[in-house]
C-alpha cells in the first residue's frame, strides 16, 4: 500500500497490481516526450509486494510498460487523469487479454485540494439498441452455453472506455490530450517484448485462433504463440492511437473504424452480433455521484467512498463491514494463533462470520443492484441497503452454522414493491468474470484516482479488427461486452433486474474505493 505525505488526504486505494513506479520529484513544465525503458521488468504469476512510499506521486498498473508510461506522464507534470490515459492505451496493447479500447471502465477521482470534490466516471458498455432479454437464449429455448454466447459478435456491446477518459480529461487534464498517446504509439510502432503472462495465456487459449486476424497477430505460421521476448509490432494500433490523439474518442464511434467494428460484429460466421453504427454514435459516458458510508474503528472514523451502481462493490463492502460490526468479529483475533502476524491463517471463527456476512451482502447485491437508469434503488437511495438498522437485522441471521444459500433482505422501501407479482425480480445467479485490470494513481497535486478497466473475459469476445485485407495490421480488441456476464441467460418466466434491454449497462462487480481517515 502506498503511503501518502501528511499534506495530502490520507486515502487507501484498493488495487490489484503487478508493478509500481513512484516519483520523488516532478517538473513544472507541461511538456512531454516519451522514452522507452531499456529493461522493463516482466513477470507471470503472483509476486508479493511490500509496499512503497512516495512524497510526490505514484502509479500502479498490471504491466511495467504501462506503469512506466504513467510514471513518465506524472514526472512531466501531468495529472492523475493524464497518466491514466497513457496507462490504459499501453495496457490495451501489451495486455489485450484484460482491457482495451473496445471495453468499458469505471473511474473514481478525488481532487487533492482541501475539500476536494470526488467524482465517479462511468464508461461501461451498453447493450445495442436491438438487444432484448432473449439475446442469450438459444433456438431450443434454453440459455446458451456461456462460451458459445461469449465468443463472436453476439456478446459485443457499445464500448465506453475512451469516451470516459476523454470526459475525465476535459475536467482534470493538464497535458494536451494528444501528448498522452505517445507511449502507446511508440510501443506499437517499434514493438514490445511478449511477456511470460501474455505468452502463457496465448498458449492456453483454445478459441482465439479461430479468428484469422487474431491468429495472424498472436501466433506464428505454425500456429504457436509468439515466444517470450518476441518483439510484437502493431502499426495499425499506432495509427488508431494517432487518430484518437488528434480527433478524439469519436473516431472509434463514427467513420471507417466504426464501420470496420460493426462489420466484424455483424458478419461473424456463426455468432453474429447486433452492434450498429447508431449504437456507437449514440454512446455517452456519464458522471455519477460516488456512494459513501462511515466505518468506525476506534479511535478512527473512516469514510469509504466507491463507485455507485451499476457497480456493486461499495454496497457489498458496506454491508459486509456493517454486518460484521454487529457480531463478535471486531473483538476476535484475525488469525488462528491469536498473534498479530501476517503469516498465520485466518481464524476459523472470524472467517465464518466474514463468509456469512458476505453471503448476506451478495444476496442483496443479486436481488437489487443494477443499472440505475433502468432500476430504482430501494427508498430511491442505494445507501438504504447500508442503513445501520437494516444491517443489524441482517446480522441476526448469522448463527454458528453456515446458512448455505442466503436470501435477500427486505429493506422497508422494498416491501410494497415485493407485494406486486408483476414487479417481482428473481435474484441474479453468479457467473464467472475475467479479463479485467486496475489502475491506481496519485499525482503531485494530490489528485487520486482508482480505475477499473475490463473486457470481461480473457481476450474479450476474441474478435480482432483489421485495417486492411491481409489481416496483419490490427487495431485492437472488440471486447466481450460486459453485459454478457450480468445480463442474464434466463428463461422467460424469470424476470430479473439485470435483464438485457436496449442501451442498458449490466451490473458489475468492479471495486474501486477511496477511504478518508477522520478529516484527512
Sequence positions of predicted segments:
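C-terminal motif of bacterial Sec signal peptides marking the signal peptidase cleavage site
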Residues: 22-23
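Internal maturation/activation junctions in enzymes
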Residues: 36-38, 331-454, 468
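Feature captures eukaryotic membrane-trafficking machinery centered on endolysosomal pathways
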Residues: 65-68, 235-272, 418-477
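Catalytic loop of the DD-peptidase/beta-lactamase superfamily, centered on the K-T-G motif
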Residues: 301, 307-312, 321-327, 453-458, ...
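Noncatalytic scaffold domains of N-terminal-nucleophile
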Residues: 28-68, 72, 80-248, 252-254, ...
Amino acid at each position: 500500500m502506498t503511503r501518502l505525505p501528511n499534506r495530502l488526504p490520507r486515502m487507501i486505494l484498493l488495487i490489484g497490481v503487478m508493478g509500481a513506479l513512484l516519483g520523488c520529484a516532478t517538473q513544472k513544465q507541461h511538456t512531454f516526450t516519451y522514452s522507452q525503458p531499456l529493461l522493463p521488468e516482466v513477470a507471470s504469476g503472483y509476486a508479493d509486494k511490500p509496499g512503497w512510499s512516495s512524497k510526490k506521486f505514484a502509479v500502479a498498473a498490471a504491466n511495467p510498460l504501462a506503469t512506466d508510461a504513467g510514471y513518465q506522464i506524472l514526472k512531466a507534470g501531468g495529472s492523475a487523469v493524464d497518466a491514466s490515459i497513457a496507462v490504459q492505451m499501453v495496457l490495451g496493447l501489451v495486455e489485450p487479454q484484460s482491457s482495451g479500447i473496445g471495453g468499458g471502465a469505471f473511474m473514481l477521482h478525488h481532487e487533492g485540494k482541501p475539500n476536494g470534490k470526488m467524482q465517479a466516471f462511468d464508461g461501461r458498455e451498453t447493450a445495442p439498441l436491438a438487444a432484448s432479454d432473449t439475446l442469450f437464449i438459444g433456438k431450443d429455448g434454453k440459455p446458451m452455453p456461456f462460451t458459445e454466447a461469449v465468443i463472436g459478435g453476439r456478446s459485443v456491446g457499445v464500448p465506453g472506455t475512451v469516451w470516459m477518459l476523454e470526459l475525465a480529461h476535459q475536467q482534470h487534464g493538464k497535458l494536451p490530450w494528444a501528448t498522452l498517446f505517445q507511449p502507446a504509439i511508440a510501443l506499437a510502432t517499434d514493438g514490445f517484448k511478449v511477456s511470460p503472462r501474455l505468452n502463457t495465456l496465448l498458449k492456453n487459449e483454445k478459441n482465439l485462433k479461430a479468428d484469422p486476424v487474431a491468429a495472424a497477430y498472436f501466433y506464428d505460421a505454425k500456429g504457436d504463440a509468439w515466444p517470450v521476448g518476441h518483439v510484437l509490432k502493431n502499426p495499425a494500433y499506432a495509427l488508431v492511437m494517432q487518430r484518437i490523439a488528434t480527433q478524439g474518442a469519436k473516431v472509434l464511434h463514427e467513420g471507417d473504424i466504426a464501420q470496420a467494428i460493426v462489420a466484424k460484429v455483424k458478419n461473424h460466421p456463426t455468432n453474429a452480433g447486433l452492434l450498429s453504427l447508431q449504437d456507437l454514435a449514440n454512446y455517452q459516458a456519464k458522471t455519477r455521484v460516488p456512494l459513501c458510508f462511515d466505518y468506525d474503528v476506534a479511535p478512527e472514523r473512516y469514510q469509504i467512498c466507491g463507485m455507485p451502481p451499476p457497480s456493486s462493490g461499495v454496497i457489498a463492502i458496506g454491508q459486509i463491514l456493517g454486518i460484521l460490526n454487529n457480531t463478535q468479529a471486531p473483538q476476535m483475533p484475525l488469525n488462528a494463533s491469536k498473534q498479530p502476524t501476517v503469516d498465520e491463517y485466518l481464524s476459523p471463527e472470524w472467517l465464518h462470520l466474514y463468509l456469512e456476512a458476505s453471503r448476506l451482502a451478495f444476496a442483496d447485491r443479486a436481488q437489487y443492484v443494477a443499472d440505475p437508469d433502468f432500476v430504482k434503488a430501494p427508498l430511491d437511495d442505494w445507501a438504504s441497503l447500508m442503513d445501520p438498522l437494516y444491517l443489524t437485522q441482517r446480522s441476526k441471521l448469522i448463527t454458528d452454522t453456515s446458512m448455505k444459500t442466503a436470501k435477500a433482505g427486505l429493506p422497508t422501501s422494498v416491501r410494497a414493491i415485493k407485494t406486486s407479482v408483476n414487479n417481482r425480480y428473481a435474484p441474479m445467479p453468479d457467473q464467472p468474470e475475467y479479463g479485467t485490470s486496475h489502475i491506481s494513481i496519485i499525482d503531485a497535486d494530490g489528485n487520486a484516482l482508482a480505475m477499473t478497466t475490463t473486457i470481461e473475459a480473457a481476450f474479450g469476445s476474441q474478435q480482432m479488427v483489421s485495417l486492411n485485407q491481409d489481416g496483419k495490421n490490427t487495431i485492437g480488441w472488440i471486447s466481450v461486452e460486459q453485459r454478457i456476464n450480468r445480463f442474464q441467460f434466463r428463461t422467460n418466466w424469470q424476470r430479473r433486474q439485470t435483464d438485457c434491454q436496449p442501451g442498458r449497462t449490466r451490473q458489475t462487480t468492479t471495486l474501486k474505493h477511496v477511504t478518508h481517515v477522520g478529516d484527512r
